[in-house]
Amino acid sequence: MQEIIASVDHIKFDLEIAVEQQLGAQPLPFPGMDKSGAAVCEFFLKAACGKGGMCPFRHISGEKTVVCKHWLRGLCKKGDQCEFLHEYDMTKMPECYFYSKFGECSNKECPFLHIDPESKIKDCPWYDRGFCKHGPLCRHRHTRRVICVNYLVGFCPEGPSCKFMHPRFELPMGTTEQPPLPQQTQPPTKRAPQVIGVMQSQNSSAGNRGPRPLEQVTCYKCGEKGHYANRCTKGHLAFLSGQ
């Protein structure tokens, strides 16, 4: 009734004009400050903001579908450059880790999304093609459908809206199903005769190396020659007494 008798839709207050044009908005002291509680910059949405990183309002670019989990804890350092949403929206919260991992969550007021595991299972492309070797152990969904006879003949007038199944004979090429790349066979490289001689001499010297004679062995416990430290009978403090 008030809109009929005295409509004020055509009246625009000075405060509304000041808010739309961001009059009196001072630039930030330094870039990179937290602007999570500020409003969205209207000029940035129109690609007309000249303040850049010093703008006191938020610069939101693109469609962000998931809330930033670090912003919820006040730990996000990316600010407007974050690829996730800095806004508390229950419909865009990330998935609950405990519910997705264990199938249950003990927090009755959990702010994260509890997604049904059945809804995340995709249809098996092999089963839709006709046969899946994994059978009931397949991690994908096996759904029985009635094949469209018209589609098998060659053409279905219903198209995608047909209530029967239109089988797809092509398979998605996953990362694990890609054919192995052919390995390049390189011819054996020929080594110089000098290098071969050095390597043979090193191998022969290493193969002929045996235990050193006891005359060259010095015991680190007593300091005498002729036996190893594990065979010393004078004790580990014999070098202090000079015995």
From Swiss-Prot:
Would the keyword Hydrolase turn up in this protein's UniProt record? no
Q: Which SUPFAM superfamilies does the annotation name?
A: CCCH zinc finger, Retrovirus zinc finger-like domains
Q: What GO cellular-component annotations does this UniProt entry give?
A: mRNA cleavage and polyadenylation specificity factor complex
Functional note: Component of the cleavage and polyadenylation specificity factor (CPSF) complex that play a key role in pre-mRNA 3'-end formation, recognizing the AAUAAA signal sequence and interacting with poly(A) polymerase and other factors to bring about cleavage and poly(A) addition. CPSF4 binds RNA polymers with a preference for poly(U).
As recorded in Swiss-Prot or TrEMBL, the protein's gene is named Cpsf4
- Principal localization? nucleus
User: Is Disulfide bond found in the keyword set?
Assistant: no
Q: What is this protein called?
A: Cleavage and polyadenylation specificity factor subunit 4
Can you name the source organism?
Rattus norvegicus (Rat)
Which ranges form a coiled coil? none
- Source organism, top-level taxon: Eukaryota
Which molecular function terms from Gene Ontology are attached?
RNA binding; sequence-specific double-stranded DNA binding; zinc ion binding
Q: Which family does it belong to?
A: Belongs to the CPSF4/YTH1 family.
Record localization: Nucleus
UniProt GO BP = mRNA processing
Positions of CCHC-type zinc fingers:
217-234
